Amino acid sequence: MAASLSERLFSLELLVDWVRLEARLLPSPAAAVEQEEEEEEKEQGEASSPRGLCPAVAFRLLDFPTLLVYPPDGPGAPAAEPWPGVIRFGRGKSCLFRLQPATLHCRLLRTPLATLLLQLPPGRPTPTPQLLGACDISLATAAHRVVGPAASGCSHRHRGRFPLHNRVGERTGDIALAYRLTDLGSRLLSQLERPLTFTRTGGGAEVSPQTQQERQQLQQPASQPSPKEADKPLGELEIPEAQKDLKEMVKSKAECDNVGSVENGKTNSVVTCSGAGNGRNVSSLNEEVTELDMETNIFCPPPLYYTNLTQEKPPPAQAKITIEPQMNAPEEMDDASPEKKRVNPPAHRSCLKHPSSAAHEHPPMLVNPPHIQNIGATNQTCQTEQNRINTIRQLPLLNALLVELSLLYDQPVTSPAHIHPHLAWLYRTEDKKSPESSAKSTCRSEAKKDKRSVGGCEKSVSLQYKKNQIENYKEDKYSEKSSGALHKRVPKGRLLYGLTNTLRLRLKLTNPDMLVVHEKRELYRKRQSQMLGTKFRIPSSKVKLLSSAEQSQKPQLPEDKYLDSDASFTENSDTSRQISGVFDEPSTSKETKLKYATEKKTVDCSKNRINNVSLEEVVSPANSIIPERLTPTNILGGNVEMKIQSPCVFQQDAVVDRIVDKEIDIRQVKTTDNDILMADISDKRTGKNSCYENISELKYSDDLSSPCYSEDFCTSEDTSRSFKAHDSSSRTENPKHSQYTSKSSDTGVSKKKNSSDRSSILSPPFSAGSPVHSYRKFHISKTQDKSLEEASSISASDLSSTHWTEQKENQIDQNSMHNSEITKRAQDISVKTRSSWKSLEKSQSPQTSQVSSYLPSNVSELNVLDSSTSDHFEEGNDDVGSLNISKQCKDICELVINKLPGYTM
């Protein structure tokens, strides 16, 4: 015990810079064989042909195992010669050993460091290496300075050039190398005390704890200063880290050489059977050489300066629990034993949650016996699992996330943690098939009653709300289907001002009125997004469905170039929801009506408030008698714009005085709007007198006259442009024909319409002189698309209603064109209108007379006025945001003076 306490740990670091050989003195194979029999402690791998030199340098310190240093290309590879006979190594080895300082001092004085240059002949198993040269390097000076009685320091280093001689004493070359001997003290011995016991069949070598402690040599990077030598860097021994050849060696007292080397976590061991010094047989030496061919020159950081053994990074989530090996045994020692038992037998791996290849990816480590490990691992597993569950229970959001993930991957939750009552609704799905059942059960088993009740309330509320949402969505879908037949579903447009569930619930409690407004806006946005897709591909079957639902027998529209108008028509008829309200009355009409009523209130409330003002505005801008409200649904883009009008109207300064009117007869309004829309469409397409006859008996609620008229749709410049363009087209074509000049142009305009629509929601109103009519016009060809944007909001008559243009002739042409269109409509339609319409008619008569010359002779001005006003108001009803003429227009002079400066009566 006293001897072991007095032992110290020493480090010997060796670096070979280069070797020079005299080519003429290279030994013959026969001579080499004789020399090797005497130098059997030198080892090494494959050799090349005599033409290629495959050298290796062997070092032997006292009776410790031999250290081999190879050229950079590794063992068996022909060494590169910068000039003939010179081989650059630049590599070295480092070893640790334990001895009593006095013993080491005494032995180093007597025994030098044996250095040999070997030639590795080719063949497998590797033949006996050939000795090319050898030299003895005295370590007496180092022993005096490090462990002698007058030791001057803990380390001594030396670099020099030493001559090589063969067995006959002839000089064969030179070797340049450096060495350093370091005293590491006794503090680190505790890390090397773990015994390594193994038996080798045939060799019969067994290493006992005592022998191991006495002759243990571990790897250490030569470039790393020892703890006691922090102030003395390596100096001349500048060994590149990448070139260090580190090999762990274990030697027994019985003169056995046990050489174990580690390469990338693989275990390979070599045991050289005991013999007296140089008396080992050649076969055991060859075996060592073969084994060490691939194992040397591998840099592995020694465990000396690490608290834990380094392990390869396991793949993520492969092993939940890893058992840390005790640090007493270096991993190289473990790897050195061939029969060593692995730490990860199946019994140990069974305690892992996910047994996998991770166990094989770690270098084997010698730890406690397997049964002890199993017990500890099982306890650790259970404890870790319990801790994890407890932690998750304190983090409800994380718990919810885990449950959601398990659902996504169809992995049932083995032991679901406590579910926070406020998050219980997360586990519910529409069909109630999700893990909410398990969640509920765990809640009840783990939560208090009050918590459960809270969770139940939350669940019920959220469920009810979700049900309502789903119902609304279904209604939307159903109405869309019924109105749009089998048309392709349009992808949702981007949400402008989204109404989240949280906001909806909060508003329901705090500000129901604002909730209504938000819902209307959302409806409006939905319609617009639907229109974007349906505008171009709505079959006429949609119109048929609508007409049948409205119980009015209107002629169906031809499918030629008015599909777009049909699409917009769907939107115009107060969107699919309103339509569904009309003919899905028993199931969904109540909810739809309510929503629609609120929407109509807001959208048409602006119409109503502006009702009085809008008539003036509409009539005055309209050079033609037709009020703005005569938005031709026949115009493809017009339908889209009717919606636009509603948001714009909100910005009007007109007083909201007729919101209540909206609610009076929502159902009536819906039917009327739909009928009017149908009538408009049929009028465009068929132009027959019977088009509007079924509408004639409809009741007109106040909203019909009240639809708002917003002036912000165009500037005077744009209006004049549209007038010119339209005028040019109208002169040569029938007014109706000009309205539908080309489907493509309508399409382009409608696209613009939609874009302008969104922007118009929050845009400030434009000049009062700019009529909505021009905005409603989509029938103008693409060449006039700029003007079309403004004109799209109203029918052809709306075109005429645009404010004055530079050329009055164009205005007159526009008026005449609109009047002629009105005339046609008058022939086709006979509608009951209120007395307010008649007064409007009278006030507009001067305009009619003005443009009467352009009307067909068979139509009277009165008819024109009649049809135009009725048409105008009917069309106004066909969409939420459509324009309307107010009843307050007393005289056309007012309109002309206020809205048409520069226009003389």
Curated annotation (Swiss-Prot):
Biased composition (Acidic residues): 34-43
Ranges for region Disordered: 30-51, 199-235, 329-362, 434-458, 547-586, 721-772, 786-855
Keyword Cell cycle: yes
Cross-referenced InterPro entries: MAP10 (IPR039302), MAP10_C-term (IPR026679)
One GO cellular component term noted in the UniProt record for this chain: centrosome
Entry annotated with the keyword Cell division: yes
Keyword annotations from UniProtKB, A to Z: Cell cycle, Cell division, Cytoplasm, Cytoskeleton
Domain of life: Eukaryota
Subcellular location as annotated: Cytoplasm, Cytoskeleton; Cytoplasm, Cytoskeleton, Spindle pole; Cytoplasm, Cytoskeleton, Microtubule organizing center, Centrosome; Midbody
A single GO molecular function term of this UniProt record: microtubule binding
One GO BP: cell division
Signal peptide positions (record): none
UniProt main location, coarse: cytoplasm
Bias-annotated ranges (Polar residues): 567-579, 737-748, 830-855
Start-end of Basic and acidic residues biased regions: 443-453, 721-736
Known function: Microtubule-associated protein (MAP) that plays a role in the regulation of cell division; promotes microtubule stability and participates in the organization of the spindle midzone and normal progress of cytokinesis.
The protein's assembly and partners: Interacts (via middle region) with microtubules.
Protein name as annotated: Microtubule-associated protein 10
Organism, as annotated: Homo sapiens
Gene (UniProt): MAP10
